[in-house]
């Protein structure tokens, strides 16, 4: 996961932490550090990590699988960091995915044109309660991620964007499926499960061995389980 997080970002090794920085966004979810497995950071390591983000005017954050570095979590808490959230992580190994076809009347396609990419983004933004005025720069960023090996799918109903999802470029056999979204008028039809299955099949076919995602809640966990994902531990997010 460290290699995957570093893709497309600048990095700095700070003690036992790999700090990653987005080149074009201050979004906290795009700027975070990951401790080495079994890391036992000193207080000076934690101070240096805090400073690495503070001098860039970024929120100091870490994200990692809790069981891989329990001492790191404790050291951060002692230094005044706080747990933002704990998120269950689910995995779908090759051979475990369930084929779920698109529901009747639903078209699944890889977005290629600007219109298709924008349609996917609008559906995602709307589903997650964000403003749907998608700037051209976001369309181009998405296109660049696809050119760099990322994955995406757009769900349409009668030509209208209904939902979508993405997966990161595969790094060392690992990728994350994310952004699974369905607009309110099209929910409870099985579109979310079909989108997830489409992306999962695509990354497996491209050689991914470790495919993971983080469900937002119990309903999402149930949906992903239908596709073949199983619980694999918790991701912890901390910030200062």
Task: Name these PLM-found stretches.
Residues 1-55, 68, 73:
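N-terminal charged segments
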Residues 56-65, 203-216:
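Conserved GNAT acetyl-CoA-binding A-motif
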Residues 40-115, 238-240:
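Acyl-donor-binding surface of acyltransferase catalytic domains
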């Amino acid at each position: 996961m460290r290699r995957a997080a570093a893709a497309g970002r600048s990095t700095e090794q700070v003690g036992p932490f790999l700090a990653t920085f987005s080149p074009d966004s201050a979004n906290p979810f795009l700027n975070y550090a990951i401790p080495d497995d079994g890391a036992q950071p000193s207080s000076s390591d934690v101070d240096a990590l805090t400073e690495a983000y503070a001098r860039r005017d970024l929120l100091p954050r870490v994200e990692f699988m809790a069981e891989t570095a329990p001492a790191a979590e404790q050291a951060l808490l002692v230094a005044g960091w706080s747990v933002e959230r704990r998120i269950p992580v689910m995995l779908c190994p090759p051979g475990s995915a369930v084929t779920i076809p698109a529901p009747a009347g639903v078209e699944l396609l890889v977005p290629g044109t600007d219109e298709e990419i924008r349609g996917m983004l609008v559906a995602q933004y709307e589903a997650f309660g964000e403003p749907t005025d998608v700037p051209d720069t976001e369309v181009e960023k998405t296109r660049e991620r696809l050119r760099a090996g990322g994955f995406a799918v757009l769900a349409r109903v009668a030509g209208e964007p209904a939902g979508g999802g993405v997966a990161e470029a595969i790094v060392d056999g690992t990728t994350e499926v994310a952004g699974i979204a369905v607009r309110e008028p099209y929910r409870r039809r099985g579109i979310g499960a079909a989108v997830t299955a489409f992306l999962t099949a695509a990354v497996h076919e491209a050689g991914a061995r470790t495919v993971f995602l983080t469900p937002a809640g119990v309903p999402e966990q149930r949906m992903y389980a239908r596709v073949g994902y199983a619980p694999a531990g918790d991701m912890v997010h901390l910030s200062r």
